């Protein structure tokens, strides 16, 4: 075994490229590089010979394409190697795809390789990239301004559909490959396009590589080390970036939202890496066209003092900054749809944002306006009311203030994203006086209830049901889905140790504890029994009433049993204190409490859980079983609800 063979074997072992039970598909063009790789693998004994086959794609781009195909067929037939050949008119395909020749050739080539691998149950694709290719690639990406993920160049292996692409020849040079081919008397075709200065790579090969080798003959090993160290750095930052995105990313139908409150405080290198990781996710890993400029544009938008801005990214991806959120969505920018409605007394209109507005005479009983209602003195306005978009120059007379204020300034003060402002309903009377922008601001025409005056009441009702609006109602993701599951695994291990051999009765407190209990008990590896109890002191409100009611009692007796109570959150503690005392009164052998969340700031009675998942701040939290007005229980994470939702 000569030095070249030894280095390739060492590289294969170092990067775990080939195992004895692998099946290899060798991509062979008919040139010296791929033919040498095939010869090396065929004679290496790394895998049995019957585990090796060949794929050749005839692009019909070069005059000697037929000769290249013939070289592959001849060699494979002489050695008894199975081979698969496909012919594609790449020029025609490029026109139909509206892509460049090189990009199209790569697409059809890998489609062919992956198809063969799937049909023949092959798990490794061997490619003949070498050390010269590596230097050229790194330099080209740096000069072009590629994102930093590309600085490490060609990787020893990468994932494909159903397998991996491997590059065993990366540690050896083009010259060494030619020597190998000549030594073994391999007949190959020379690609005449490799000498054309029309192609960028060829210019690097002809002009830069000779200079670098002349400056330092060890340039190959230096670039190899640079590639490996850069790749290691990338993987380390990638893991941190992935964790950062898990905590700050919401997938909401066609829109993906990055929460900026915490994200923008992270170090710049981590922000850049996270943005690139996010773009790769959005583009389904095909983000080769993403450059440093794209990433810096997004970072600048995040760090800018301008709270409302947007940029267009490749392939019709739009990034919209809306104060503390950055939205990504594919498609053309939405042109604001104009609307204009007349609202007569006792009428109700439906808006495109799934909200409705109703105008009625006030009833004889006292009514409060709230955030979703407004009382008007009939003598001060002219019907019908008008519900429309904002228009340039709109001004509102403010309650408790002298003079009027531009709607634009009101929206800025309220932090309404620019792209949302044209969608908001503006309610005026028939003479044009602006009365109300629901959810934003009421005018000076807002009145208190009067028994003596004729008054109208406007009701604005927003549908907060449904998946899309549900996520939009969340101010911040407090605990991600991954963090929840990691903590549940930890609690499961602790409870397994605690209750092994004791056959506890596990009591779930309905309804909120159901998701937590379901996931937790999957992680408790011992015999147990389950029961449920519904005990409440909240009703449909947001503040504990202090009165505890049993809505559903236990089916099983707790007498003499070890009881484990599972709850979603301990807030005031009244409900849990009552329940624990009740179970003790019923002569349980022991009672312990496990809660997913503990909110000490809300405590009104002395009670502590034996097992706690997370301590949370004094915020209105929902999701993963926790609700507001029976909504949001099905969120997969714990989030902080926007105040305007539970204040309505």
Curated annotation (Swiss-Prot):
It is found in: Cytoplasm. GO terms for cellular component: cytoplasm. It comes from the Bacteria. Binds 2 magnesium ions per subunit. One of the ions does not make direct protein contacts. PANTHER family: TRNA(ILE)-LYSIDINE SYNTHASE-RELATED. GO terms for molecular function: ATP binding; guanine phosphoribosyltransferase activity; hypoxanthine phosphoribosyltransferase activity; metal ion binding; tRNA(Ile)-lysidine synthase activity. Mg(2+) binds at residue 627. One of its GO terms (biological process) is purine ribonucleoside salvage. ATP binds at residues 29-34. Its main location: cytoplasm. The keyword Ligase applies. In the N-terminal section; belongs to the tRNA(Ile)-lysidine synthase family. Keywords: ATP-binding, Cytoplasm, Glycosyltransferase, Ligase, Magnesium, Metal-binding, Nucleotide-binding, Transferase, tRNA processing. It comes from Listeria monocytogenes serotype 4b (strain F2365). It catalyses: IMP + diphosphate = hypoxanthine + 5-phospho-alpha-D-ribose 1-diphosphate; GMP + diphosphate = guanine + 5-phospho-alpha-D-ribose 1-diphosphate; cytidine(34) in tRNA(Ile2) + L-lysine + ATP = lysidine(34) in tRNA(Ile2) + AMP + diphosphate + H(+). This is Bifunctional protein TilS/HprT. The N-terminal region contains the highly conserved SGGXDS motif, predicted to be a P-loop motif involved in ATP binding. Transmembrane segments: none annotated. The lineage of its organism: Bacteria, Bacillati, Bacillota, Bacilli, Bacillales. Its cofactor is Mg(2+). Its EC number is 6.3.4.19, 2.4.2.8. NCBIfam families: HGPRTase, lysidine_TilS_C, lysidine_TilS_N. The keyword Cell membrane does not apply. Ligates lysine onto the cytidine present at position 34 of the AUA codon-specific tRNA(Ile) that contains the anticodon CAU, in an ATP-dependent manner. Cytidine is converted to lysidine, thus changing the amino acid specificity of the tRNA from methionine to isoleucine.
